[in-house]
């Protein structure tokens, strides 16, 4: 069909379909996510459905994250007006609606990175709630790894933030746990890249 021909020319989907060589240019995790949902849609009878499922994933993640931004503003004691303004910024600015419908790695990465920044702010402003909370620190580490795996240069934002947080957090007992999160992010990111390149033989792409 015409739709199938269009998707064959779309970089990440064409790699999943075997039309182009599989590379890590767009990050392997992002390409896999595209591919899994595209193939699910195809299995259900429609390539368009597969693309729609990926866009729905982006929509759900970003809608929840942007809602968390508003909730965090409320937690900081911001007025209702500020909370409404934050909500309006995400809900009414047309750039966000267009961005959510864009089938690229940047959309999902943006949502998760905003959440990572939000959790970093939470760590620095409310450190007492993080003290001894392994589930919270584990989720923080997983989030950091995902940010690195969905965009190659994500590591250049995540690692400095973690390093700075480790030495500026007011609760000194949190320094080692945050450094442990930093170590986990580096191991997870480099480990995944090494596995896909050396074991799965997927050639590396440009940084971006």
Model-derived features: positions:
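Short hydrophobic/aromatic helix or loop-helix immediately within or flanking a transmembrane segment
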Residues: 22-55, 59
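Short helix- or helix-capping micro-motifs
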Residues: 83-94, 144-148
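Short, small-residue-biased leader/transition segments that mark boundaries at the very start
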Residues: 2-7
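Membrane-interface alpha helices of multi-pass inner-membrane proteins
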Residues: 136-151, 184-188
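Specific aromatic-rich, kink-prone transmembrane helix
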Residues: 17, 68, 108-127, 140-144, ...
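Short acidic/glycine- and proline-prone juxtamembrane loop motifs at membrane-interface regions
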Residues: 101-108, 150
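Juxtamembrane membrane-water interface segments immediately following transmembrane helices
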Residues: 12, 156, 177-208
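Transmembrane-helix motifs of polytopic, lipid-linked glycan transferases
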Residues: 56-77, 115
């Amino acid at each position: 069909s015409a739709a199938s021909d269009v998707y064959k020319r779309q970089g990440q989907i064409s790699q999943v379909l075997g039309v182009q060589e599989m590379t890590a240019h767009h990050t392997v995790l992002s390409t896999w996510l595209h591919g899994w949902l595209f193939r699910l849609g195809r299995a259900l009878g429609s390539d368009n459905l597969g693309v729609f499922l990926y866009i729905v994933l982006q929509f759900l993640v970003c809608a929840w994250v942007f809602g968390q931004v508003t909730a965090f503003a409320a937690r900081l004691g911001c007025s209702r007006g500020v909370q409404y303004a934050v909500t309006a910024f995400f809900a009414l600015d047309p750039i966000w609606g267009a961005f959510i419908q864009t089938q690229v790695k940047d959309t999902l990465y943006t949502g998760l990175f905003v959440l990572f920044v939000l959790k970093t702010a939470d760590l620095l402003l409310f450190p007492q709630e993080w003290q001894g909370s392994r589930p919270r620190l584990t989720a923080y580490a997983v989030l950091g790894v995902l940010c690195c795996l969905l965009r190659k240069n994500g590591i250049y934002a995540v690692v400095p933030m973690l390093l700075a947080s480790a030495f500026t957090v007011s609760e000194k007992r949190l320094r080692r746990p945050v450094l442990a999160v930093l170590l986990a992010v580096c191991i997870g990111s480099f480990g995944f890249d090494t596995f896909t390149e050396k074991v799965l033989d997927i050639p590396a792409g440009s940084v971006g």
